[in-house]
């Protein structure tokens, strides 16, 4: 729903425009956003394996009515979510939520790209359980702490009206019972 009206999201996964970021001009950003508009898209997902985009990207999405599914920059891996690294992750999330929260285009914050899928669907869980069950449990608990506790708390505290989704793709796989 958007402003009380049902919305069907039509969009694409957005990755950085160039591996050399300074080569991306404002005109290039505008072309990409207008290409989405002209393709009848209304949403772009900022991929968690990329970057938090420049303000011009979000300003153009605001201007042209493109909703943004904003991934946090965690992708296709497990991260030792404890101690100083977990605090660094938290601070990065706070900084980016605060920076982007006033953009009306931000429709959703998403914890990561494919980390749960990798754990359950790509066989990481079985692999780690076979190697060392205690280590597998530690990894899973850290994943839960990061994507189901810490990041949703950051979003709730810093952008309380925003939606949060733990991972993309996401299905329960029975793991949260």
Predicted regions span which residues?
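Short secondary-structure boundary/hinge segments and terminal tails
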Residues: 54, 78-80, 173-175
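Active-site region of glycoside hydrolase catalytic domains
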Residues: 97-177
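Active-site-adjacent substrate/metal-binding segments within catalytic domains
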Residues: 1-77, 86-108
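Hydrophobic alpha-helical scaffolding
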Residues: 79-86, 137-141
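Short, glycine/charged-enriched secondary-structure capping and boundary segments
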Residues: 58-60, 83-84, 123-126
